[in-house]
């Protein structure tokens, strides 16, 4: 059955791969990005029809509210929500600027809280499924990523708690925690050295994370779970 899937951070990386896979499955996509042109261009490139690209900065509540007002008026009921918008500002804690800390927390944690709040209101009458994007760093921690790790660890606790709150309304909430994936965030890493820490011996691809997300979105008896998609990286951290 075709459903309306709302994908934040859908114009690149994991979010783009998720949008493409969901469209291939026959779902209608509302794709959101801070860059309106990128959102619209990506939406137009997806298989199928009637996809929509909108601009939204998830760290700003008024923009999230405006986006969902548009979705509610023009698209109807939301079946799936994917929270793939995220940033990092990696640095040792003593070298981290407070404005960077706030930017990471507001985008990675508060942003997903705001989008979930708006989506749940839409889903209350008919149910739905939400997948948040965390990180293996949120599970295990990593030197030089204290703030990013905190934002993703907080998202895990939020995901489990929200799953408990809305299960009675047939709304499922899960989280995918990727490891090292070929995206803009990992473009500057020394890949040859990094893969030595991964049991499967390679970086993952956005499409592989998208497959895990699709599994959670379409699995009717799974909620409150954290699914690591990391090639076994957590085994050696």
Swiss-Prot record:
Look up the record and report any one GO term of the cellular component aspect: oxidoreductase complex
Which GO BP terms, alphabetically? fatty acid biosynthetic process; protein heterotetramerization
SMART domains to which the protein is assigned, alphabetical = PKS_KR (SM00822)
What transmembrane ranges does the database entry give?
none
The protein's annotated pathway: Lipid metabolism; fatty acid biosynthesis
Annotated compartments: Mitochondrion matrix
Q: What is its main location?
A: mitochondrion
Name of the protein described by the UniProt record = Carbonyl reductase family member 4
Q: Which GO terms describe its molecular function?
A: 3-oxoacyl-[acyl-carrier-protein] reductase (NADPH) activity; oxidoreductase activity, acting on the CH-OH group of donors, NAD or NADP as acceptor; quinone binding
Keywords attached to this entry: Fatty acid biosynthesis, Fatty acid metabolism, Lipid biosynthesis, Lipid metabolism, Mitochondrion, NAD, NADP, Oxidoreductase
Binding locations of substrate: 135
Q: Which InterPro entries match?
A: NAD(P)-bd_dom_sf, Sc_DH/Rdtase_CS, SDR_fam
**What EC number(s) does the entry state?**
1.-.-.-, 1.1.1.-
Question: Does the record's keyword annotation contain NADP?
Answer: yes
What's the stated role of this polypeptide?
The heterotetramer with HSD17B8 has NADH-dependent 3-ketoacyl-acyl carrier protein reductase activity, and thereby plays a role in mitochondrial fatty acid biosynthesis. Within the heterotetramer, HSD17B8 binds NADH; CBR4 binds NADPD. The homotetramer has NADPH-dependent quinone reductase activity. Both homotetramer and the heterotetramer have broad in vitro substrate specificity and can reduce 9,10-phenanthrenequinone, 1,4-benzoquinone and various other o-quinones and p-quinones.
What binding partners and quaternary form does the record give? Homotetramer (in vitro). Heterotetramer with HSD17B8; contains two molecules each of HSD17B8 and CBR4.
The entry's family comment says: Belongs to the short-chain dehydrogenases/reductases (SDR) family.
Quote the record's binding site residues for NADP(+): 11-14, 34-35, 57, 84-86, 148, 152, 181-183
Record NCBIfam families: PRK12826.1-2
Report the active site residues: 148 (proton acceptor)
Q: Which organism is it from?
A: Danio rerio
- Annotated SUPFAM superfamilies: NAD(P)-binding Rossmann-fold domains (SSF51735)
């Amino acid at each position: 059955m075709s459903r309306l899937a709302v994908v934040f951070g859908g114009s690149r990386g994991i979010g783009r791969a998720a949008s493409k896979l969901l469209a291939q499955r026959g779902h209608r996509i509302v794709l959101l990005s801070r860059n309106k042109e990128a959102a619209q261009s990506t939406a137009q490139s997806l298989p199928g029809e009637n996809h929509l690209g909108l601009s939204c900065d998830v760290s700003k509540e008024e923009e999230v509210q405006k986006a969902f007002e548009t979705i509610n008026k023009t698209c109807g009921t939301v079946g799936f929500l994917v929270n793939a918008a995220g940033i990092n500002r990696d640095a040792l804690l003593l070298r981290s600027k407070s404005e960077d800390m706030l930017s990471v927390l507001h985008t990675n944690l508060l942003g997903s809280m705001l989008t979930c709040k708006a989506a749940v209101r839409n889903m209350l009458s008919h149910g739905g499924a939400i997948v948040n994007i965390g990180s293996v760093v949120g599970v295990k921690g990593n030197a030089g990523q204290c703030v990013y790790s905190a934002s993703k660890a907080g998202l895990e606790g939020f995901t489990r708690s929200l799953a408990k709150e809305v299960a009675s309304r047939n709304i499922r909430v899960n989280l995918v925690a990727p490891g090292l994936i070929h995206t803009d965030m990992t473009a500057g890493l020394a890949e040859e050295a990094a893969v030595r820490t991964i049991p499967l011996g390679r970086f993952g691809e956005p499409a592989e994370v998208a497959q895990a997300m699709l599994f959670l979105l379409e699995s009717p008896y799974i909620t409150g779970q954290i699914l690591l998609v990391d090639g076994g990286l957590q085994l050696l951290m």
